[in-house]
A protein has these predicted regions:
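Mature extracytoplasmic/periplasmic domains
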Residues: 305-373
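A ligand-binding cleft/hinge motif common to bilobed small-molecule-binding domains
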Residues: 117-120, 270-285
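Extracytoplasmic ligand-binding site segments that recognize negatively charged/polar headgroups
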Residues: 56-73, 107, 112-260
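C-terminal motif of bacterial Sec signal peptides marking the signal peptidase cleavage site
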Residues: 17-20
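Conserved C-terminal helix/tail region of periplasmic/extracytoplasmic solute-binding proteins
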Residues: 366-401
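Periplasmic-binding protein-like
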Residues: 137-140, 237-243, 282-306
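A bilobed periplasmic-binding-protein/Venus flytrap-type ligand-binding module shared by bacterial periplasmic
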Residues: 168-175, 211-213, 298-311, 329-333
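Early extracytoplasmic/lumenal segment of secretory-pathway proteins
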Residues: 22, 36-120
Length: 401
């Protein structure tokens, strides 16, 4: 639970290949599920499993591939090795940008990619489509996580959903009254909590501002907070510049945010459920809510390297990691909702899935999951260009000053 220690200020690099990839997609209702707006390289998924190759190189967020080294009681790698004969080498990474760069080396077979990295990996040809029929446990993954813009392109799956969560509005109950249910407490320039706001430190946070504007300035026409044309992007950036005097701290490590909430340096902010749980467990009076405007969030996907020399082991790993028992172990240790619907029966804390809204499709619908912004608008528009992540990164530098 205490292992999403992510220094994610530089979630994506400026060298975004997506802007140059293919043609723009259609916004019609007949458009296939998944991402639109670019054409990935033509790569074929694995046709059938062979003999396990005896090795597997795993690139993972800390806490996703535990072998007992950090905690002897937390180990789902060794059972996999014993079951398959695939010797696992784990390389943890700290940011999505780091993961993307490491995947380019071809040294890794599988990667746990967040939505802000997955499309880059697809567009560059560093990962290939996944034959989900070779992953039996895929059948039990929640339907609302399948064939989404961050893990599929034109109805072709590029990975196996693993876990997910929302970026929640969080506050100290002894300092913030009445209980807020809107992001306005963080964005309104007249907020009574000036100098006490905690905001996420990443260019992807521009999407949070866009989501707020989508509801509060509908005349901007924002349909997707990751698909912003010039006017929409300027409005989101201006809102974040207006917010800057309200902010006490920009956080990229949830432990530091928890500390700020505990000591009162910050009284309201955006946080993960694991942050709320930890802060509460250490005595601070905090609560959280998914606001009326909705929220941004993440859904992580296991993807297979196009250069992998151990593809049978890779597929066996994906099936293992989303099996009910293991998916439950990872979700509890990492601090997120599991992707496998049957995992909830396997959690040690029987309230875990309720706390994290694991099977709550309506809750999930309110989340705008991290996705890589590209020049071809992800909302299907073809008459304008949208701002790509390189421009988001430059704007974030200006916002923070």
């Amino acid at each position: 639970m205490k292992n999403r220690k992510l220094a994610v200020a530089g979630l994506l690099g400026a060298g975004l290949l997506l802007a140059a990839c293919g043609t723009s997609g259609s916004g019609s209702s007949s458009a296939p599920p998944g991402a639109q707006g670019f054409t990935p390289p033509t790569l074929e998924p694995l046709g059938q499993l062979g003999q396990p190759e005896g090795a597997l190189n795993v690139l993972a967020w800390p806490g996703y591939a535990e072998n007992g080294a950090n905690d002897p009681k937390v180990n789902w790698v060794t059972p996999f090795e014993q079951e398959t004969g695939c010797k696992v080498n784990v390389k943890p990474f700290g940011t999505s940008d780091e993961a993307v760069n490491l995947m380019k080396t071809g040294d890794y077979d599988v990667v746990s990619a967040s939505g802000d990295a997955s499309l880059r990996l697809v567009a560059s040809g560093d990962v290939e489509p996944v034959n989900t029929s070779l992953v039996p446990n895929y059948a039990d993954v929640y339907g609302f996580l399948k064939n989404k813009p961050w893990n599929s392109v034109n109805n072709v799956s590029y990975g196996v959903p693993h876990g997910w969560g929302a970026n929640l509005l969080t506050w100290r109950t002894d300092k913030v009254t009445p209980p807020p249910n809107s992001w306005s407490v963080m964005f309104d320039q007249n907020s009574p909590y000036k100098g006490k706001v905690i905001a996420y430190d990443s260019p992807i946070y521009i999407a949070d501002a866009a989501l707020y504007l989508q509801k509060h300035q509908p005349e901007l026409g924002i349909k997707d907070p990751y698909a912003l044309d010039d006017k929409q992007f300027k409005a989101a950036v201006d809102l974040l510049k207006q917010q800057r005097p309200l902010v006490n701290e920009y956080w990229s490590d949830y432990l530091k945010e928890s500390q700020a909430l505990k000591n009162g340096d910050g009284v309201v902010g955006t946080a993960w459920q694991v942050t709320v749980n930890l802060t509460k467990s250490e005595g601070a009076p905090v609560e959280s809510v998914l606001p009326t405007e909705g929220a941004t969030g993440w859904s992580d996907t296991w993807m297979v390297s196009a250069k992998s020399k151990h593809k049978t082991c890779a597929y066996k790993w994906m099936n293992h990691i989303i099996s009910p028992k293991v998916n439950a172990q990872v979700a509890e240790y990492f601090g997120e909702a599991p992707g496998n619907a049957k995992a909830c029966a396997e959690t040690t804390d029987k309230k875990h899935c309720d706390t994290y809204h694991a099977g709550d499709a309506e809750f999930a619908k309110k989340i705008s999951y991290w996705t890589t912004p590209i020049a071809q608008c992800l909302d299907g528009r073809t008459d304008v260009k949208c701002k790509d992540y390189g421009e988001w990164t430059r704007a974030w530098t200006e916002i923070k000053g």
